[in-house]
C-alpha cells in the first residue's frame, strides 16, 4: 500500500504517519457490523441502477468456495468454518468434486453488466439452493426483481426456487435439470417404458406423493398364468394376484418440468450465466480464494468489502467517463 500514496490519501490515511498494523485491521474486521457494510453495498447498487449501469432483467446466482485459513486435516484454528464440497464441472456426466474447509460466497450478479447486486457468505456446508430465496428477497429490497430472468446452474434445480421466481417475482427461470436420483428408462416412441425382458409395459394408473404426480407402469403379463417370467424377475413369483415389475415416470405437471431446455431460446439465454463465472474469477483475484482471517465474522466482512470494492471500481469508472469499470488496475492508475 505504501506505493499508492494518492490512494491512501483518498482513503483517509495520513501518508506522513505509519499505516495501521495488521492487528488493527484484524480487530476492525472482527468487530465491524456486517449490516453497515451491506447498507454501503446496497447504496452503491442503487446508485448504479439509477445511472443505468446495472439492471435486474437478467440475473444469475452462483457461489464460489472460500478456503479457510486452516489446515485441511485440522480445522480447529477456525471454529466457524465448515466442510464443503465444490463441483469442478457443471456437466452431469462428470463427477469431479473437491472437498474443503471454509465458506461460500453466494453472489447475485447482473448478467449484463457483470456487477454484483447482493452477496451472502455462509459456512461451506450450506447448500446453494437453501439460501436462494433469502438472497432474492434481500436483493429485491434494493432493486426490483419483478419480471426478471433468473439464471442458475443445476445446483439450484429445486421446485421451490422455480415457484418463487414464477409467483413472487413474475419472472422466468433458466436452470438445467439435475439428474440426481433418476434412471435412464428405455422407452418406446409412445412413452411406454420397456421392461428388462424387452417388452412394452402397460399403464396402471397414477399416484400423487410429495407434491408430484407419477404415472405407474406394470408388467404386460402381470395376471398371466405362465409359471416362468421371460427375464426371471424377482417379483414374478411373489404369490400375489398382480405379478412382475413396475416402473414410474413423473408427469410434467409443474413449472419446473414444463420448461423446454432443448430449445435455442433456453440455450442462448442460459449462456448469459457465464457472467457469474467471470465475476467469481475477478472476486478470487482480490485474494479471497483463501482467507487470512480465522473467524466467521471477519470472513463475512472481508467478502463484503471485496464486493464493495468491485462496485466502487465501477462507480469511479462511470463517474470519470471510463468504460473500464471492471478493472481494478485501471482504477489504481487513474488514482
For the regions a language model picked out, list residue spans one by one.
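Short, charged amphipathic recognition helices of the HTH superfamily
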Residues: 1-6, 277
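Major-groove recognition helix of helix-turn-helix-like DNA-binding domains
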Residues: 2, 12-32
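Blade-loop segments of beta-propeller domains
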Residues: 7-11
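Polybasic low-complexity intrinsically disordered regions
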Residues: 25-167, 174-178, 303
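Short, charged, surface-exposed secondary-structure boundary motifs
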Residues: 130, 181-190
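Short amphipathic alpha-helical "interface-anchor" segments enriched in bulky aromatics
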Residues: 187-213, 217, 249-296
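Long, low-complexity, polar/charged, intrinsically disordered or flexibly structured peripheral segments
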Residues: 218-258
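Basic, amphipathic alpha-helical segments enriched in Lys/Arg and hydrophobic/aromatic residues
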Residues: 266-335
Amino acid at each position: 500500500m505504501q506505493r499508492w500514496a494518492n490512494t491512501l490519501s483518498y482513503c483517509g490515511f495520513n501518508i506522513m504517519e505509519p499505516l495501521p498494523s495488521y492487528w488493527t485491521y484484524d480487530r476492525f474486521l472482527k468487530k465491524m457490523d456486517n449490516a453497515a457494510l451491506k447498507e454501503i453495498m446496497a447504496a452503491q447498487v442503487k446508485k448504479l441502477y439509477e445511472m443505468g449501469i446495472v439492471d435486474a432483467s437478467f440475473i444469475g446466482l452462483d457461489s464460489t468456495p472460500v478456503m479457510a485459513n486452516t489446515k485441511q486435516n485440522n480445522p480447529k484454528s477456525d471454529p466457524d468454518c465448515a466442510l464443503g464440497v465444490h463441483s469442478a464441472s457443471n456437466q452431469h456426466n462428470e463427477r469431479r468434486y473437491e472437498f474443503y474447509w471454509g465458506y461460500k460466497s453466494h453472489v447475485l450478479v447482473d448478467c449484463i453488466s457483470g456487477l454484483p447486486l447482493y452477496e451472502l457468505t455462509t459456512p461451506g456446508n450450506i447448500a446453494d439452493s437453501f439460501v436462494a430465496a433469502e438472497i432474492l428477497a434481500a436483493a429485491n429490497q434494493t432493486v426490483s426483481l419483478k419480471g426478471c430472468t433468473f439464471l442458475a446452474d443445476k445446483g439450484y434445480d429445486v421446485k421451490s426456487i422455480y415457484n418463487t421466481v414464477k409467483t413472487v417475482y413474475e419472472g422466468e427461470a433458466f436452470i438445467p435439470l439435475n439428474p440426481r436420483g433418476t434412471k435412464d428408462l428405455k422407452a418406446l416412441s409412445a412413452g411406454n417404458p420397456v421392461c428388462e425382458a424387452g417388452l412394452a409395459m402397460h399403464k396402471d394408473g397414477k399416484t400423487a406423493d410429495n407434491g408430484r404426480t407419477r404415472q405407474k407402469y406394470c408388467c404386460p403379463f402381470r395376471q398371466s398364468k405362465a409359471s416362468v417370467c421371460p427375464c426371471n424377475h424377482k417379483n414374478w413369483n411373489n404369490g400375489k394376484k398382480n405379478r412382475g415389475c413396475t416402473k414410474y415416470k413423473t408427469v410434467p405437471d409443474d413449472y419446473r418440468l414444463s420448461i423446454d431446455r432443448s430449445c435455442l431460446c433456453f440455450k442462448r439465454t442460459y449462456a448469459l450465466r457465464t457472467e457469474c463465472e467471470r465475476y467469481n474469477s475477478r472476486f478470487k483475484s482480490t485474494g479471497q480464494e483463501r482467507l487470512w482471517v480465522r473467524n466467521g465474522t471477519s470472513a463475512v466482512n472481508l467478502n463484503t468489502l471485496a464486493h464493495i470494492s468491485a462496485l466502487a471500481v465501477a462507480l469511479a469508472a462511470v463517474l470519470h467517463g471510463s468504460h473500464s469499470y471492471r478493472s481494478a488496475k485501471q482504477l489504481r492508475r487513474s488514482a
